[in-house]
């Protein structure tokens, strides 16, 4: 086995076609200077990351270094990395933003010890947003619907509704 076989797919693609690698794992800039994301190519990049043997290394490096950009590392975008970082920090009993204080190998070992981390991450992200929405709804002021009692005049005695025709 030579060194080329050990090279991850993202590095091989970046060496052959850097523009394609940017579209798969990073952003491209249009003429106006805005960052563009090619979702179709990102999907292909995520598929390559899912099969990559170095995926846990990429994820642990991104989590410990705290990269806050629009790039994809190990198949995860920033929001997913943030959710995973919270999950790992809670499990390791450190502050949410404290992953940069621990060795990268410890984060990688945690990922290797918990092969169900992707499902736990999805569940944790879903639960987080559920709690946030409940908190938001609990703070909302609701208008109470008071019954509408309009002032009325008493009916005169002896008056009966007549026929219309």
Feature-to-residue mapping (PLM):
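Short flanking/linker segments adjacent to small metal-binding domains or redox-active Cys/His motifs
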Residues: 88-165
């Amino acid at each position: 086995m030579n060194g080329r076989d050990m090279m991850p797919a993202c590095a091989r693609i970046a060496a052959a076609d850097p523009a394609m690698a940017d579209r798969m794992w990073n952003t491209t800039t249009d003429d106006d200077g805005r960052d563009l994301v090619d979702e179709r190519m990102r999907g292909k990049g995520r598929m390559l990351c899912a099969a990559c043997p170095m995926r846990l290394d990429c994820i642990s490096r991104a989590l410990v270094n705290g990269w806050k950009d629009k790039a994809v590392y190990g198949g995860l975008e920033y929001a997913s990395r943030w959710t995973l970082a919270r999950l790992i920090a809670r499990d390791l009993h450190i502050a949410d933003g404290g992953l940069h204080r621990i060795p990268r190998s410890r984060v990688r070992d945690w990922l290797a010890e918990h092969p169900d981390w992707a499902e736990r991450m999805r569940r944790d992200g879903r639960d987080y947003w559920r709690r946030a929405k409940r908190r938001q709804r609990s703070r909302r002021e609701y208008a109470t619907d008071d019954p509408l009692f309009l002032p009325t005049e008493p009916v005169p005695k002896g008056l009966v509704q007549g026929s219309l025709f």
